[in-house]
């Protein structure tokens, strides 16, 4: 793959993570650059790892992986989205302080859910005999940058109440998961 194709692929793979990061940033109380970079690093490492895993699995069991990857992504994102939406809907009218950071587990689960499509790309690249390491590295770096920017953009958009942001963020995650599932089931671009 040439550099332009690699960068375009990396941008495409980071789009879901960017959208999730905006909602994560909006839920935080004035996230600082360090929190944005921490979130970006978590997403970037996971997003870079999944095409490597996909490429490895593609060498061994492509049919099985591609048959289930979209269901895994949908399940993770739907679970997280429903959890966020429920949390936003069940508030009891009390003003809730926004937290200063998200837990590692929550960020890693969200990153994993948004990176399952990168695993599929890894499977596909295994059949094309493409060196996966530079591609995975580019995906990780671009995702780290996009997610860090997304968290900071979420800070700007985060003036809405925490509950509204949780509901919107949850619906975004459910939407991303549903779109991944739809694309795989119906072959939409």
From Swiss-Prot:
Membrane topology of the entry: Multi-pass membrane protein
Cellular component, GO, one term: plasma membrane
Keyword terms of this UniProt record: Cell inner membrane, Cell membrane, Ion transport, Manganese, Membrane, Transmembrane, Transmembrane helix, Transport
Transmembrane segments: 3-23, 41-61, 62-82, 103-123, 132-152, 167-187
Pfam family, one: Mntp
The keyword Hydrolase is annotated on this UniProt entry: no
InterPro entries reported in the protein's UniProt record: Mntp/YtaF, Put_MntP
Highest rank taxon of the organism: Bacteria
GO molecular function terms noted in the UniProt entry: manganese ion transmembrane transporter activity
Localization per Swiss-Prot or TrEMBL: Cell inner membrane
Family of this protein: Belongs to the MntP (TC 9.B.29) family.
Its job: Probably functions as a manganese efflux pump.
PANTHER family assigned to the protein according to its UniProt record, in alphabetical order: MANGANESE EFFLUX PUMP MNTP-RELATED
UniProt-recorded name of the protein: Putative manganese efflux pump MntP
Gene behind this protein: mntP
